Amino acid sequence: MSDIQLNTLKPAEGSKHAKRRVGRGIGSGLGKTAGRGHKGQKSRSGGFHKVGFEGGQMPLQRRLPKRGFTPLGQHLYAEVRPSELQLMEAEEIDVQALKAAGVVGQSVRYAKVIKSGELSRKVVLRGITATAGARAAIEAAGGSLA
């Protein structure tokens, strides 16, 4: 293999395409109308319509019905799995501890433990709710909900 030098670097064969030079004479194949065809709105300079415009026909985004909504409180609640509690070092866990450990996002105000995974160590939850299955798993491991 030869020495690579800055003045000998070249792009890979076929990786670069020559720029289309339009309107440069008949022989170029893109002269006169420059590949725009004859007449019509799209052949004119500045002759383009806005995205979604369908020539006056009711556009698709207005023909389709509105659907659903975005709940305003969706970022306030978070679900936590017992396996995530298992990885935390603290024995007493509240929402602030979950935020500090990166288990839930910073905008979360309320957390709920769901039954998904196993818990084998004692944890005390403060200000955190749990489903019936999760509560049973926490209490079986010697923990509690305060």
Curated annotation (Swiss-Prot):
Cysteines engaged in disulfide bonds, as pairs: none
GO process annotations (BP): translation
Membrane spanning residue stretches: none
Domain of life of the native organism: Bacteria
Annotated Gly residues bias: 24-34
Keywords recorded for this protein, A-Z: Ribonucleoprotein, Ribosomal protein, RNA-binding, rRNA-binding
Database matches in SUPFAM superfamilies: Ribosomal proteins L15p and L18e (SSF52080)
Matches recorded under InterPro entries: Ribosomal_uL15, Ribosomal_uL15/eL18, Ribosomal_uL15/eL18_sf, Ribosomal_uL15_bac-type
Pfam families: Ribosomal_L27A
Region (Disordered): 1-65
GO CC list: cytosolic large ribosomal subunit
GO molecular function: rRNA binding; structural constituent of ribosome
Subunit structure: Part of the 50S ribosomal subunit.
Role played: Binds to the 23S rRNA.
Similarity comment: family membership: Belongs to the universal ribosomal protein uL15 family.
Name recorded for this polypeptide: Large ribosomal subunit protein uL15
Native organism: Bordetella parapertussis (strain 12822 / ATCC BAA-587 / NCTC 13253)
Gene: rplO
